[in-house]
Amino acid sequence: MSEQFILQPGQLSLLSIKQILDEELSCVLAENSFELIRASHQTVKKVIDEKKTVYGINTGFGSLANQTISSDCLKELQRNIVLSHACGTGKLLPDDVVALILLLKINNLSQGYSGVRLELINALIALFNHKVYPCIPSKGSVGASGDLVPLAHLSLPLLGEGEVRHQGQVISAEEGLKLAGLKPLELEAKEGLALLNGLQVSTALALSALFISETLFETAIISGSLSVDAASGSDVPFDDRIHQIRGHQAQISAASMYRNLLAGSQIRESHRHCNRVQDPYSLRCQPQIMGAILHQMQFVGQTLQVEANAISDNPLVFAEQGDILSGGNFHGEIIAMAADNLALALSEIGGSAERRIALLIDKNFSGLPAFLVRESGLNSGFMIAHVTAASCASDNKALAHPHSVDSLPTSANQEDHVSMATSAARRLHEMIDNTSTILAIELLAACQGLEFHKPLKTSPQLDKIYQSVRSVVKEYDKDRYFAPDIEKIKKKILDKEFSLLTLTNE
């Protein structure tokens, strides 16, 4: 078993989530949560013993909430909700996302507001620790009442139903339970609904996208700085005085990143007193653009950290007062809006990078050979690589359409306004692929542009990036098969090889 992480329910930070996933830590539930969990479960049992009618415990669900269920059918009711709601479609969610969903669901249930047994939570922990990941189709949730469909698929294996993935192989739930040291569970009152109600899928998809987007943000700062040097651009627009008087801290921070990266460039010094007085906006306004993006990403991070610890079940059990209350914490509007904001940020990262590629290949602006290759005409150079970047940028603009405004009523109009949080978060991963492609092309184009400035060199910091690119992709002295080069640089980007932290630590 791997190194352990003691989970204090409701106290996950973004940093701890990254650590748990990156280091593949095992989860151990803090013992001080046990009594809260037991008290919550006892509150549910008391409702049954006293023959009270409470939604989700002894009633139907959704628009069937007015149907009372007899006490001898309560276990069947909970099993039925899992089976009937497991109707997702589409590609399976990747293992890293499913691991995060499990972690968030464990964190949610173990806070003692859902009325489930400790045995159920321990079963989820066993799946997480043994890397037995339920097969969850990516489509089917509208983000209210929670992520019902995908969370039903998460829950199926606990009943011995469905399939799981272990070490990349899809196997039966029965085999998966054995690997985790488990047997099929018989759900008790409220437990099926507690497993299904919640926004852990939307939150996990959004968090996963945020973590990768942070890497893309840093890469874009680096690739944009390289483009400034390759295009003989000016570093004057990054002067701290300009940004201090506007006052936005994220913009001030972004400008500092550009100054640090470009410091010591021989190329910059060679044309410091030239006649060109202003650069195009995609070079000159990078701190303003990337500062706004950083601000949005910080907001998204703050929102998702709260949501990672939020109770999004319904109904909610308040054991101390003996109350079980129905509300609407399962509505994912805030996640949908956060995902929409992150989509805007990703679109702008890719869109501004595409514009810089266009500048670099234009000999009339950059002063470099047409399409960044000698003997242009015989060679097409970066002509069509830019077309690929433009295609990806255009895709992102369409994908950035806000999902939070796109509600459709469900469940016979009982659930008449939904958030679409899951689709809002899911599309971010397609945007990430597009954006990483654009940034890979910009890195290749900017490094190719540097070739024409030799023997002058870029800054020491940016030269490290140049050398990293050249370690897997050689200079373009003539046309060759281009696609593999883009994929090599995309891999480096997603492996976090072009990060500001990496440069700082070298």
From Swiss-Prot:
It holds the Pfam family Lyase_aromatic. Keywords: Cytoplasm, Histidine metabolism, Lyase. InterPro entries: Aromatic_Lyase, Fumarase/histidase_N, HutH, L-Aspartase-like, Phe/His_NH3-lyase_AS. Belongs to the PAL/histidase family. Contains an active site 4-methylidene-imidazol-5-one (MIO), which is formed autocatalytically by cyclization and dehydration of residues Ala-Ser-Gly. It is found in: Cytoplasm. It comes from Legionella pneumophila subsp. pneumophila (strain Philadelphia 1 / ATCC 33152 / DSM 7513). One of its GO terms (molecular function) is histidine ammonia-lyase activity. The keyword Cytoplasm applies. This is Histidine ammonia-lyase. One of its GO terms (cellular component) is cytoplasm. One of its GO terms (biological process) is L-histidine catabolic process to glutamate and formamide. The modification 2,3-didehydroalanine (Ser) is found at S145. It catalyses: L-histidine = trans-urocanate + NH4(+). PANTHER family: HISTIDINE AMMONIA-LYASE. The gene is hutH. Pathway: Amino-acid degradation; L-histidine degradation into L-glutamate; N-formimidoyl-L-glutamate from L-histidine: step 1/3. Its EC number is 4.3.1.3. It is an enzyme of class 4 (lyase). There is a cross-link at A144-G146 (5-imidazolinone (Ala-Gly)).
